[in-house]
Amino acid sequence: MFKSLCFSAALLLFWGRVAAADDASRPYPPPAEVRAKLLAQLDRPRVPLDPQVTLVEPGEAGLIVERLTIASERKADGQIERVPILIVRPKETGTPRPLVIFLHGTGGNKESQVHWLVRVARLGMIGLAIDARYHGQRAGGATGAAAYVDAITAAWRVKPGQPQEHPFYFDTVWDLWRVLDYVGQRPDVDPRRVAMVGFSMGGIQTWLAAAVDQRVAVAVPAISVQSFRWSLDHDRWQGRANTISGAHRAAAEDLGEPEVNQRVCRVLWNKVIPGILDDFDCPSMLRLFADRPLLIVSGELDPNCPLEGARIAFAAAEQAYKEAGASDRLQIDVAEGVAHHVTGKQEKLIADWLVRWLQTPEKTPPEKGQ
């Protein structure tokens, strides 16, 4: 009986890998074409960065805390969208240092990343966090994800021909490119040693923003690697939809559906994050990282990022890194029995990954801009 169960489990694992490999081989456009398409999709006129520093003060253990904002874009109503930034850095200046950007999840804010900013600053790096669109200081006084859900609902209801925002990931991706413009101007930052680490929503923003921007030398998308297409096709969309359930319920009502279902998700996602079910899905985007150091951190039981879909993305990344002769620069860690959570062991893995790949500058400078 025991041998039979073991054989069955092994067979299921084998066929799961075969299915992932088959889906990973799904023909996506070449990486350069995907990169160009995403840049074009999100493009908008740049405005001067206009950094405005609001605070520089001593922090714990001889560290320095900075708070500032930068300009990201001029919106359709003429208002300048500004990105709030929190930085923790070593007190000593002189030799340019590595910098790590940390991104929070849905309903969070930059303050939730302070422990990471302090951790990397103690390692001699500069830590930076931002508030995503409609989060933190950008939520208009709302708490959690309320303003974010309202913004996505409003974006869903925009009529054809009217200005269309993309608060569901894409607009924050643009902000991150502007943050990279800013850090590239700081004399205390080594532009060859910039990393991006994101959790949940922030992880998705990481594999979108950093995939197409070579200025990000090292990336860690945590509890975020998945396949949106697989989740929808296999009726496993619920975890992702529930992170912004109010927007999905509004879309269901507008579409005349009694409840949120696959059709609602498909129509909503195609409008507010166009391309996420096709060329901009995670299995396609991870190919663009090769051969930069990429650490993927996932949970075996994560309902937001079903493992079966995540394996498709894993396989796509493994193939791309193999073809680039850089398999040693890709690491995938799946925590057994863990849902949508980063374990203490995985946190140490992230810190060690940053130290490993940011200690020594690369010889080739990054491309300017995206």
Q: PLM features: what roles do these ranges have?
A:
Residues A251, F314-G369:
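C-terminal catalytic histidine-bearing segment of alpha/beta-hydrolase fold enzymes
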Residues I101, T106-W174, F228-D235:
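Cap/lid segment of the alpha/beta-hydrolase catalytic domain
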Residues Q41-T95:
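N-terminal cap/lid segment of alpha/beta-hydrolase-fold proteins
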Residues V218-M285, P306, A310-F314, A320-S327:
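Mobile cap/lid helix-loop segments that gate and shape the active-site cleft of serine hydrolases
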Residues T95, A147-S200, V216:
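Gly/Ser-rich "nucleophile elbow"/oxyanion-hole loop immediately N-terminal to the catalytic nucleophile
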Residues F289, I296-S298:
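Short beta-strand/loop motif that positions the catalytic acidic residue
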Residues W177-G246, G275-L277:
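Primarily recognizes the serine-hydrolase "nucleophile elbow" in alpha/beta-hydrolase
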Residues V88-R89, R97-G105, S298:
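The conserved beta1-alpha1 loop
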